[in-house]
């Protein structure tokens, strides 16, 4: 009997799972919030701009070391039988390190400098740099831009590097290496400085055939090309391959065999496809969490406007992986719950339920459109299909009779409408959607939301029993790297998580949602394209950081 470890680094917490490679059984698990959380308003008591989202890399080592030690001890499994370790990570979450690959935020002189810290995926401080990168690419007719949805996001690696070059050159001067946090964890495990094709391909303008797009970087700033060449470029390891064995010292520290193999890191949402078994084309998978990723696989590379990228072999060898997404989903619902009136909070407490459960109870019998509300879910910008992190959310139809649960439902529906925009974009560009999978912690807990999604999308919705699908997907890659399975497909068939339930759309609800969706799309186009300056002008009055 052999086992594999999956380490899943999310936005707010980390998870370490020990998985049976024969049947996918979870033998042991460890879950812990990051000690320093997400650093968004203050760093060591100093105010930071509202567009920033930072983390402390020491939290990642804490998860890895405490988590692996715990599952080995708790499971009583002989470490010799743990054949592989896989890692998934939020992306683009990047780390700046010294020549010893130690993060520069640990240097005393940079303790209070926000640019020395990990730039989390949802850090939007590089929006000006992203715009410059985009405009330069458009002006020079870079054909490969279509592989990234004809857009550049401030969430990606290169704009974040440009941000540090422009605003904290002293940090860049002390930086020897820049890498995805997932690559950094792989380095700590193996002592090898390599890069995953998944992370580079989706977040750093790197392609298997051509490498980095230095022609574009040179036109922006020759110094940028040199930074990428000297500090980012490294040997690339593809998903499905092995980086190598555990470093001897790390094996001893973690209580594992030094023969344990380590796979390259995979982006967290992408790992979910493996965890639930969505490994074919014509299947769209929604990974619902803090944000939502909408993923598809296809034999061909289509240039789909408004998506976040398409990369060959980033999930399954030889297939192109496509990613689109929404920047605020779980975060948005959490925001609404925190605004609940005290009477709702008290009622939920008295009935021994959460505020979410209370609001779901209040809305579950409402018909679509009953509240008279419709919302734009852009509270953290719009990733797809508008690709504009500076857009903000709106809600329409409020009256003095509007209740808090009506607002909550409007936001549930808004995220479903945003998903429909993405699904239609895929379909308009020759990628048929026959099945829709939903995975992550939210679908398992919120049947009301899943009913809304099935009827808005007008598709059978397959809800997976997969609160921890990324960790399972990471463990699958660990199993392949350790030789427990001959291929990713074989490992997926053996280890994937089961279906929880399926929902079929209802004709009356579908019809009502079609009417609402037309209104959503009209508002989407007005505030996203035609009159986008209205909300941006209001935002410009905020204090600049």
Curated annotation (Swiss-Prot):
Superkingdom of origin: Bacteria
Functional pathway: Carbohydrate degradation; L-arabinose degradation via L-ribulose; D-xylulose 5-phosphate from L-arabinose (bacterial route): step 2/3
Catalytic activity: D-ribulose + ATP = D-ribulose 5-phosphate + ADP + H(+); L-ribulose + ATP = L-ribulose 5-phosphate + ADP + H(+)
GO BP: L-arabinose catabolic process to xylulose 5-phosphate
Keywords: Arabinose catabolism, ATP-binding, Carbohydrate metabolism, Kinase, Nucleotide-binding, Transferase
Gene Ontology cellular-component annotations: cytoplasm
Extent of the signal sequence: none
GO MF annotation, one: D-ribulokinase activity
Family matches, as Gene3D superfamilies: 1.20.58.2240, 3.30.420.40
Pfam family of the protein (one): FGGY_N
InterPro entries: ATPase_NBD (IPR043129), Carb_kinase_FGGY (IPR000577), FGGY_C (IPR018485), FGGY_N (IPR018484), Ribulokinase (IPR005929)
Keyword ATP-binding tagged: yes
E.C. number(s) listed in UniProt: 2.7.1.16
EC class of the enzyme, as a word: transferase
NCBIfam families from the UniProt entry: PRK04123.1
Family of this protein: Belongs to the ribulokinase family.
Entries under PANTHER family matching the protein: FGGY CARBOHYDRATE KINASE DOMAIN-CONTAINING PROTEIN (PTHR43435:SF4), RIBULOKINASE (PTHR43435)
The name this protein goes by in its record: Ribulokinase
Organism field: Staphylococcus aureus (strain bovine RF122 / ET3-1)
Species classification: Bacteria, Bacillati, Bacillota, Bacilli, Bacillales
